[in-house]
């Protein structure tokens, strides 16, 4: 029970800032503990990797088109030579619309955040301001202990 009740400093910082940059020990396990703490406080959580995310504004908040792998099959006729486009729901926008009534909000936890560009980091800083029910946590690298700082400070330094 002590693992669930601790972590209030992290939760306060996340609610105050909206977006945090996290540094966790490389052996892992810490993100699961803090996600469990967030869920116990009433937040829903989504975990994605920042690699291959594409355009964050489109992939996270809008319906967007993707081209599935063609697996050696050619398109014939009126479709483009590169393949058909399939439209998928937004990764964050759709779950955000369908949050349970008793949920405080939605936490987007991104792994491998060191691959994000400064423009993408600044987008993640402004995202919780545009949608107050959304909180963003981005793992930026490793550290000896679990630490965090506002994502705005990391985006300015990048």
Swiss-Prot record:
<keyword id="KW-0813">Transport</keyword>
<keyword id="KW-0521">NADP</keyword>
<keyword id="KW-0874">Quinone</keyword>
<dbReference type="GO" id="GO:0048038">
    <property type="term" value="F:quinone binding"/>
</dbReference>
<keyword id="KW-0520">NAD</keyword>
<comment type="similarity">
    <text>Belongs to the complex I NdhN subunit family.</text>
</comment>
<dbReference type="GO" id="GO:0016655">
    <property type="term" value="F:oxidoreductase activity, acting on NAD(P)H, quinone or similar compound as acceptor"/>
</dbReference>
<keyword id="KW-1278">Translocase</keyword>
<keyword id="KW-0618">Plastoquinone</keyword>
<keyword id="KW-0472">Membrane</keyword>
<dbReference type="GO" id="GO:0031676">
    <property type="term" value="C:plasma membrane-derived thylakoid membrane"/>
</dbReference>
<dbReference type="Pfam" id="PF11909">
    <property type="entry name" value="NdhN"/>
</dbReference>
<dbReference type="InterPro" id="IPR020874">
    <property type="entry name" value="NAD(P)H-quinone_OxRdtase_su_N"/>
</dbReference>
<comment type="subunit">
    <text>NDH-1 can be composed of about 15 different subunits; different subcomplexes with different compositions have been identified which probably have different functions.</text>
</comment>
<comment type="function">
    <text>NDH-1 shuttles electrons from an unknown electron donor, via FMN and iron-sulfur (Fe-S) centers, to quinones in the respiratory and/or the photosynthetic chain. The immediate electron acceptor for the enzyme in this species is believed to be plastoquinone. Couples the redox reaction to proton translocation, and thus conserves the redox energy in a proton gradient. Cyanobacterial NDH-1 also plays a role in inorganic carbon-concentration.</text>
</comment>
<keyword id="KW-0793">Thylakoid</keyword>
<protein>
    <recommendedName>
        <fullName>NAD(P)H-quinone oxidoreductase subunit N</fullName>
        <ecNumber>7.1.1.-</ecNumber>
    </recommendedName>
</protein>
């Amino acid at each position: 029970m002590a693992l669930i009740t601790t972590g209030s400093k992290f939760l306060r910082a996340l609610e105050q800032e909206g977006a945090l940059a996290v540094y966790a020990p490389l052996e892992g396990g810490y993100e699961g503990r803090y996600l469990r703490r967030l869920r116990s406080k009433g937040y829903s959580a989504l975990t994605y990797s920042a690699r291959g995310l594409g355009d964050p504004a489109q992939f996270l908040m809008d319906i967007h088109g993707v081209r599935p792998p063609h697996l050696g099959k050619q398109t014939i006729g009126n479709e483009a030579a590169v393949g058909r486009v399939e439209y998928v729901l937004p990764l964050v926008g759709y779950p955000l619309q369908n949050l349970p009534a008793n949920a405080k909000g939605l936490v987007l936890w991104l792994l491998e955040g060191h691959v994000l560009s400064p423009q993408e980091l600044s987008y993640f800083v402004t995202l919780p301001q545009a949608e107050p029910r959304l909180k963003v946590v981005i793992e930026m690298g490793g550290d000896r202990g679990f630490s965090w700082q506002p994502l705005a400070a990391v985006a300015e330094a990048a």
